[in-house]
């Protein structure tokens, strides 16, 4: 069986320990704060906790994709050794990172015509993307081939459910997801939007919750509707500095389902730049992505 490596990018928000344990190659997107550029990799000097404290101070970060040059540099190290590459990319609907990787592949194929570089537009983000990478890495550990893993991810990426809620509407307003009027009314009425990632990898609103407690209940209810074979699943929960809510949601899940495991971790600095503080998300395999 041919040798291969798995790549992803930092939009997957996988914890440092998991990236190292599962031997995943990681490329960091970039977060810009006060004219300082931070590469969002597993050894980033800006921790999620410190990042969210900066958001509380009113700082508004911006982000940028991984460019094709960095992909060429990272991929070529393996290609020139004849090692195949499987890259699971951040949703093309949310970032140009996937397109950068395609440009890099074409450039490398001109130099190395026999290079085997498989690229998947996961149409996923945050720990939803991370969960696909986790399953891919576990399959590699179990001896599956690159072709088997590639096929599994392509077949299952539109069953990877992303459901989340945000505590503040400010960042959605800034990103053009809702109007200033809707944000003002929503904040006044304590309305919490409920969102999901659709089959195209785009963010969409599917409901509104009155208050935080109701929004957590609705996340759990969406999981109840969609989850398949829960006793065989590892569920990921991501939060932007609201770990108590994440633990509450995890307990709701454990009380009903004998899941294999639940991982709770921070939303990273790139995704967090667009969601803001108080976002809570749950990721799992379901019958369909759509609510």
From Swiss-Prot:
Signal peptide: none annotated. Keywords: Lipid-binding. Residues 4-286 form the DegV domain. Gene3D superfamilies: 3.30.1180.10, degv family protein, Dihydroxyacetone kinase, domain 1. The keyword ATP-binding does not apply. The keyword Nucleus does not apply. Hexadecanoate binds at residues 63, 95. One of its GO terms (molecular function) is lipid binding. InterPro entries: DegV, DegV_C, DegV_domain_contain. It comes from the Bacteria. May bind long-chain fatty acids, such as palmitate, and may play a role in lipid transport or fatty acid metabolism. This is DegV domain-containing protein CPE0026. It comes from Clostridium perfringens (strain 13 / Type A).
């Amino acid at each position: 069986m041919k040798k291969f490596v798995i790549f992803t990018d930092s939009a997957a928000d996988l914890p440092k320990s998991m990236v190292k344990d599962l031997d995943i190659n990681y490329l960091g997107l970039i977060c810009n704060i006060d004219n300082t550029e931070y590469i969002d990799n597993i050894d980033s000097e800006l921790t999620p906790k410190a990042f969210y404290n900066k958001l509380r101070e009113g700082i508004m970060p911006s982000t940028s994709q991984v460019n094709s040059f960095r992909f060429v540099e990272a991929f070529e190290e393996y290609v020139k050794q004849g090692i195949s590459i499987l890259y699971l990319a951040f949703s093309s609907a949310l970032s140009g990172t996937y397109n950068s990787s395609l440009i890099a592949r074409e450039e490398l194929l001109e130099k190395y015509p026999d290079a085997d570089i498989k690229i998947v537009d996961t149409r996923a983000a945050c720990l939803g993307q991370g969960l696909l990478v986790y399953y891919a890495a576990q399959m590699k550990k179990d001896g599956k081939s690159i072709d088997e893993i590639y096929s599994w991810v392509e077949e299952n990426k539109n069953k990877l459910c992303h459901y989340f809620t945000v505590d503040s509407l400010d960042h959605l307003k800034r990103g053009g997801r809702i109007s200033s009027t809707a944000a003002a009314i929503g904040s006044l009425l304590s309305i919490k939007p409920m969102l999901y990632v659709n089959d195209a990898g785009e963010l969409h609103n599917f409901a509104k919750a009155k208050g935080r407690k109701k929004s957590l209940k609705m996340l759990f209810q969406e999981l109840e509707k969609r989850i398949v074979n829960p006793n065989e699943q590892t569920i990921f929960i991501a939060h932007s500095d609201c770990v108590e809510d994440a633990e509450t949601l995890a307990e709701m899940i454990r009380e009903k389902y004998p899941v294999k495991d639940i991982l709770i971790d921070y939303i990273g600095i790139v995704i967090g730049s667009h969601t803001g503080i108080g976002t809570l998300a749950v990721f799992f395999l379901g019958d369909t992505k759509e609510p």
